[in-house]
């Protein structure tokens, strides 16, 4: 049976509520990530796009604690006043339906997106979707070791394109192109 793929991207507050000191393994490994504020998915088997702005968990709406605004552009005071925010518990049943039995594809899946999914589900006492995961960042590092591997850089050298990075919906649209390009290449080329 052929795998069905779902392109996925989270944006999170990036707020370090536990004042975790940076670890040698890097920024992403020293954080707690049950703080999604935006999620986008594209189900490649149907072409359907899903895009949610998510009400952050109250733990991450703390006076004096900044978000990763320089990355995604969302300012806490403005974001929490949006009228299109949904609760994770309301969004999750559809996310689970879309992902279950398929392969989630994300750029930095094993260093970020999969962890966000697992920690958020754990925080809300939900079972994560039963799906496989693929990490395009790891795959591109292996396939093109001499190239830059951030998604923005890959879009530039692979397609000579720029896009609105760190908007979850724009990230999944670009990652869909990147993934389909690298997924078409036979494995024997990289032996």
Residue ranges and their predicted role:
Residues 2-118, 130, 152-159, 166:
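Conserved non-catalytic scaffold segment of RNase H-like nuclease domains
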Residues 3, 157, 169, 173-191:
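Acidic two-metal-ion nuclease catalytic site recognized across multiple nuclease folds
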Residues 144-174:
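Metal-dependent de-N-acetylase/amidase catalytic core
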Residues 123-129:
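Short helix-capping segments at alpha-helix termini
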Residues 133-149:
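Short alpha-helix plus adjacent loop in nuclease-associated cores
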């Amino acid at each position: 049976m052929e795998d069905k793929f779902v392109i996925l991207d989270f944006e999170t507050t990036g707020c370090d509520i536990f004042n975790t000191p940076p670890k040698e393994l890097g920024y992403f490994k020293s954080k707690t990530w049950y703080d999604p504020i935006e999620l986008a998915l594209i189900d490649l088997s149907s072409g359907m796009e899903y895009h949610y702005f998510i009400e952050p968990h109250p733990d991450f709406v703390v006076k004096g604690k900044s978000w990763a605004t320089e990355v995604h552009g969302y300012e806490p005071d403005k974001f929490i006043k949006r009228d299109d925010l949904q609760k994770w518990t309301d969004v999750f049943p559809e996310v689970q339906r879309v992902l279950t039995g398929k392969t989630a594809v994300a750029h930095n899946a094993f260093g970020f997106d999969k962890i966000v999914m697992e920690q958020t589900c754990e925080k809300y006492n939900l079972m994560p979707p039963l799906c496989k995961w693929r990490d395009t960042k790891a795959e591109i590092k292996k396939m093109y070791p001499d190239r830059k591997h951030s998604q923005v850089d890959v879009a530039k050298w692979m397609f000579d394109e720029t896009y609105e990075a760190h908007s979850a919906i724009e990230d999944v649209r670009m990652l869909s192109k990147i993934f389909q390009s690298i997924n078409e290449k036979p494995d024997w080329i990289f032996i």
